[in-house]
Amino acid sequence: MADNSAHKKYPLLDLYTPPTTPPARPPKPRWGLRRDRNGNDAGLKQSGLGHSSSSSSSTSSSSSNRPRPTPPPRKPVHERVDQWTVTGPGTVTLQVKTPTGTQVILTVHL
């Protein structure tokens, strides 16, 4: 009787629905894959495209000749706002100085 009362109280609640599986994740970019101890890509070993581990000297020399993928650029850490002023109703001016000495003045209209 407890199950029937729950269905009467909450008609959209279905207690017998099997749990849904989450959608498949997209594959990681190549630079995000873990590397094994020899320095080869883990994805290459799984797909069968990696070098054999019988000759470690040729594996290390050939893997160093391959161009390595570069990760995406990151936001500079040392940029900071030196001064900000309210120049009018809904307007703010920011002065940003980069580590290289470049100074940028931004005017933001809110």
UniProtKB/Swiss-Prot annotation:
Keywords recorded for this protein, A-Z: Early protein, Host cytoplasm, Host G2/M cell cycle arrest by virus, Host nucleus, Host-virus interaction, Modulation of host cell cycle by virus, Phosphoprotein
InterPro entries per UniProt: Papilloma_E4
Any one GO biological process: symbiont-mediated arrest of host cell cycle during G2/M transition
Comp. bias regions, Polar residues: 84-94
A Pfam family: Pap_E4
Modification after translation, per record: Phosphorylated by host ERK. The phosphorylation triggers a structural change that enhances keratin binding and protein stability.
Function as written in the Swiss-Prot or TrEMBL entry: Contributes to multiple aspects of the viral life cycle including viral genome amplification, suppression of suprabasal cell differentiation and egress of newly formed virions. Induces host cell cycle arrest at the G2 phase by associating with and preventing the nuclear entry of host CDK1/cyclin B1 complexes. Inhibits cellular DNA replication by preventing loading of host replication licensing proteins MCM2 and MCM7 onto chromatin. Within the cytoplasm, associates with host kinase SRPK1, a splicing factor regulator, and inhibits its activity.
Similarity-based family: Belongs to the papillomaviridae E4 protein family.
Name under which the protein is recorded: Protein E4
Species name: Human papillomavirus 29
Underlying gene: E4
